[in-house]
Amino acid sequence: MIFAAGLGTRLKPYTDHCPKAMVEVAGKPMIAHQLMKLKRAGFTHVVINVHHYAEQIISYVDANQGFGLKVTFSDERGQLLDTGGGIRKALSLFDTTNPVLIHNVDIFSNADLAALYAKHIESGNDASLLVSKRDTSRYFIFDDKDSLMAWKNIQTSEVRTSNNDLRTTLDQVNGDDATYRLRAFSGIHIIAPTLFPLLEKQDEVFSITNFYWQQSSQHAIRGIEAPQGFRWVDAGKPEALAKAGEIVRESYK
C-alpha cells in the first residue's frame, strides 16, 4: 500500500494545484517511482489511498495502465483518516492471507523491499518496521531483541508506551545501551494479517505509530535495522527533492 492521501502542506507551493504524489522527482511524479520500485521488488497488487487532488493521481495511474500492476484506490476524499485509519479503511482491498507492505509516497531510499518482505515472513513478526540510526526528534525504543517498547520525543522527553511497568526505565533512555536502542522510523513497514482484526476495532481516524506502541506489549512488533549504506530521504519538503532525485538515479533502476 502507498500512502498518498496527505495534503502536502510542507511541499507548498508545489502542492497548491496538485497532490504530493504528483510532484516530480528526477523527471517523474513520485507515485510513478514508487509503483515501479514495488513492481521491480516483485509486488503485483498495490492499494493507493487518495484525498488531495485525488483525481489527478487516479487519472495518471490509469493512463499508464497501473505501470503493469493491479492498482486499487482507497478513496479518502470525504475525510482524511491519518495513517492507521487509512490502513483500516483499505483492509477490504487487501489479500488478507498475506502481509501488506506500507510505503509513504514521499519516502525515497535504497531499501531492498523484496529482501525486507522476505525477512518479515521469516521472522513471524506481527509487524516489522524498517528503522535506522539517524538524527531526528522522534524515535522508537527497541529492546535487545528488536521488540518495540515505546515511542519517544527527545526534545520534549515525552514517552508513550504500553509497557507501564518499565515506564520509569524507558523515560531514562536517551541513547543506545546494553538493553535499549533508539531508532528512527523510515515510513516503510509490513503488517501481518494477525493484526487486521485489531485494526478493524480501532476508531475511524488514528495514527499507525500510536497503534504500534499500544500493541507492542501484546504482539510481536519489531524493528528491522536498515543495512550499512542505507540512504533515505523524506521528500516532503522542497529542499529534499534534489536528494530524492539522487537516490532515484542511483537506486530506482
Model segments located where?
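N-terminal nucleotide-binding beta1-loop-alpha1 segment
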Residues: 1-16, 39-41
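Conserved N-terminal catalytic core of the sugar/cofactor nucleotidyltransferase
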Residues: 2, 28-104, 115, 202-203
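Active-site metal-binding loops of divalent metal-dependent hydrolases
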Residues: 7, 105-107
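Short catalytic helix/loop segments, enriched in acidic residues and glycine
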Residues: 17-32
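Catalytic-core segments of class I nucleotidyltransferases/pyrophosphorylases
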Residues: 99-101, 108, 114-121, 134-135, ...
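A short, conserved acidic/glycine-rich loop-to-beta-strand motif
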Residues: 123-133
